[in-house]
């Protein structure tokens, strides 16, 4: 899940590893950041 993401989304989202391999980014499919 996105529990470790440094950003969260108020709609459908996907979590991906950050380029540094440690941080996760939460990418909103609708581009709606919370």
Curated annotation (Swiss-Prot):
This is Omega-ctenitoxin-Pn2a. The presence of a 'disulfide through disulfide knot' structurally defines this protein as a knottin. Transmembrane segments: none annotated. GO terms for cellular component: extracellular region. Its main location: secreted. Disulfide bonds join 2-16, 9-26, 15-28. Expressed by the venom gland. One of its GO terms (molecular function) is calcium channel regulator activity. It is found in: Secreted. Keywords: Calcium channel impairing toxin, Disulfide bond, Ion channel impairing toxin, Knottin, Neurotoxin, Secreted, Toxin, Voltage-gated calcium channel impairing toxin. It comes from Phoneutria nigriventer (Brazilian armed spider). Belongs to the neurotoxin 02 (plectoxin) family. 01 (Tx3) subfamily. It comes from the Eukaryota.
